[in-house]
Amino acid sequence: QVVSNDRNARRFLDELGISGRYPAVRGDFIGVTTSNAAGSKIEIKDLGAVRGLMDELIYAAVFSDNDKTRKDLFILTKEIAKAAGAIPSSIQGLYEELGRDYHGFTVPAINIRGLTYDIARTIFRKAMEVDAGAFIFEVARSEIGYTKQRPLEYTTVVLAAAVREGYRGPVFVQGDHFQLVRKNFLSDPNAETGYIKGLIQEAIDAEFYNIDIDSSTLVDLEKPAIKEQQRPNFEKTA
């Protein structure tokens, strides 16, 4: 069982079924001090054991048929991963430096649409082998829909993959093309704008610290002047 000195925390983890159902989750290597996974203070006592735990936790979370259990396991796993050194981060500071005088490389962005845990593990493993610099994991609005990967799942799976491969440091996760659908916007601007705002909030709550707002679909090429063509784009983005 996951070890905790807090009885409420132990009860919370037992309610998830971790200690009884998932034999990989054993040993005195994690301490959880509160019953709320999102606010728990997690102490890693055996990093090697935690790395081995990731496969089991991700499988349990992704394939659980209970929505609450899935969410709780994703939150718990994400917090464990952060305590193990995989830190969700914003790439804004690096981009600011690139815009000034730090040149000579690009930042690859990778959209994973399936087998996300396995593919992310491969990416981290190869990045460490070649001593790669920054790279981003992305998922677009459309991909969230047809792959059924909500932001919390995507972030958690990527962070768990980082821990599993022994990666420590910033992990960049981006909402790619959080795009307004033109026909939806023309039909009901407030509803479509509200949907994108809600998706952005969900992504930030899941610790996406990079958001690509895409309202280029609203460009009106029937206008004679370029600025007026682009006005719906830049005004809605703002």
Residue locations for each model-derived region?
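Helix-rich catalytic cores of soluble enzyme domains
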Residues: Q179-A238
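Alpha/beta catalytic barrel-like cores
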Residues: Q1-Q174, R182-E192, F208
